Amino acid sequence: MATIDKHSYAHMFGPTIGDRVRLGDTDLWLEVEKDFTEYGEEVKFGGGKVIRDGMGQSQASCFDTPDLVITNVVILDHWGIIKADIGIKDGRIAIIGKAGNPDVQDNIDIEIGPGTEIIAGEGQIVTAGGIDAHIHFICPQQIDEALMSGVTTMIGGGTGPATGSNATTCTPGPWNTHKMLQATNDFPMNFGFLGKGNTSLPIALEEQIEAGVCGLKLHEDWGTTPASIDNCLSVAERYDVQIAIHTDTLNESGFVEDTLGAFKGRTIHTYHTEGAGGGHSPDIIRACGESNVLPSSTNPTRPYTINTIDEHLDMLMVCHHLDPAIPEDIAFADSRIRKESIAAEDIMHDLGAISMIASDSQAMGRVGEMITRTWQTAHKMKQQRGPLAPDTERNDNFRLKRYVAKYTINPAISHGISHEVGSIEIGKLADLVLWKPAFFGIKPAMIIKSGFIAAAPMGDANASIPTPQPVYYRPMFGAHGQAPANTSMTFMSQASLDAGVPDKIGLTRMVSACKNTRNIGKDDMIHNSWQPTIEVDAQTYEVRANGELLTCEPVTTLPLAQLYCLF
């Protein structure tokens, strides 16, 4: 068999087993664990290349071949880091393995035919589309920002720049819910809306769930009392939807112990569990040790830098309608911003005690930076804490799996949508993000919705080739016409689907019911299920996990930052 040198092979077909890839300008290194392609039998498209009639392409009917194959790509997901070809059929991942023509090649899993499109994945990394589970739907322009960053699913609440939506992730009531469902029908993004959960009687919650929300949100600005918590969770248990909560910063209606008691062991997603984004001061972070709590962070505290504290005070005053002329409002803001718990938050992410990261879009968070902030946190922790067992100095594979799970599979599990999205697995929607390694985590090379390209960097449309400047992110055909509705999904309660809500309000897009939200717990958070005993010193705000002080220094510089954002 003819061979080529390793450098030439990597340049032509991408890395293989044992090869390492640096992610962006971080200190994080990926190492390929398994390669499904076969040396000498790789498929590649182009003039004089393999995927031609009678060579790498068969004569098979379109019914028997994929609509799209991504060739020779490195998959980074919670379950592994492998190199493979990915076959996509009818908008879903059909098979992961070796592509080619079984007429002339052995051991072919994916048959390429005349009806198959090709995306060259050589030298690139593919991840599942990001899931941002803390969205304030304040303006529709957020959707483009999120999509271009690699997010393909947005879960949250809001009705636009209403005062309530600026502060709380709630879409209150059936009328507002229907309007938001209709408004988002034609966007190339998956959606799930959270209704307002703050009430002590069931009827208004039942109406919202039956109207089409995928869950409910309890927010302190609407009054997160023990009675409303108990009532909201009781309704959720009957309807199989998730509850998200922003707890009582001022401890007016109870302390963290009262809130944890009101949960009564029932599953709940705690937003910004460190507390800077809101929650019992100073010790809401204790919730990370509870088996029924699914904790997440929002990205403004990710990671802890020299600017984190200062910018939070200004953000808080605006987002929560506070008045700097009122001393009590200033005290409220000061009570939420604690450097000790923000430092501990970094370490708790690295140890898997906080399971998810989201944005808190335009309400103390940046919708286009969820993925970037996640990898910046991973980089900072490697710099400050070294390899994360069982990793060695050679690669960071386990750390990468832990962190990618925080914005893909774990929010999908938490909100009952992991049967449709959240990972690169057979049968799920082909919501995929391609990255060139040098731009990993900040500038995607392509965003694919259900197997169809929705967004990508693109050059001058009047140029003779696709690459001349100015190159910037633009919507592709998957973002136009009827394509978004046929490649994107809205997640709703089963009760609303049973009631025929999509047809009644004229939705034309795909819909799916969220499910299995009430029989899960922290143990189900992949690579992020640690449940330590958390203690917070009420005077110093120091955080300890199982007796060990959790602290780290803020950093002065970060990767995936100005170097990539000059224009």
Swiss-Prot record:
GO molecular function term, any single one: urease activity
Residues bearing PTM N6-carboxylysine: 217
UniProt-annotated binding residues for substrate: 219
CC per GO annotation: cytoplasm
Domain Urease: 129-567
Reactions listed under catalytic activity: urea + 2 H2O + H(+) = hydrogencarbonate + 2 NH4(+)
Record keywords, A-Z: Cytoplasm, Hydrolase, Metal-binding, Nickel
Cofactor(s) this protein cannot do without: Ni cation
Enzyme Commission no: 3.5.1.5
Spans through the membrane: none
NCBIfam families: PRK13206.1 (NF009685), PRK13207.1 (NF009686), urease_alph (TIGR01792)
Name used for this protein in its record: Urease subunit alpha
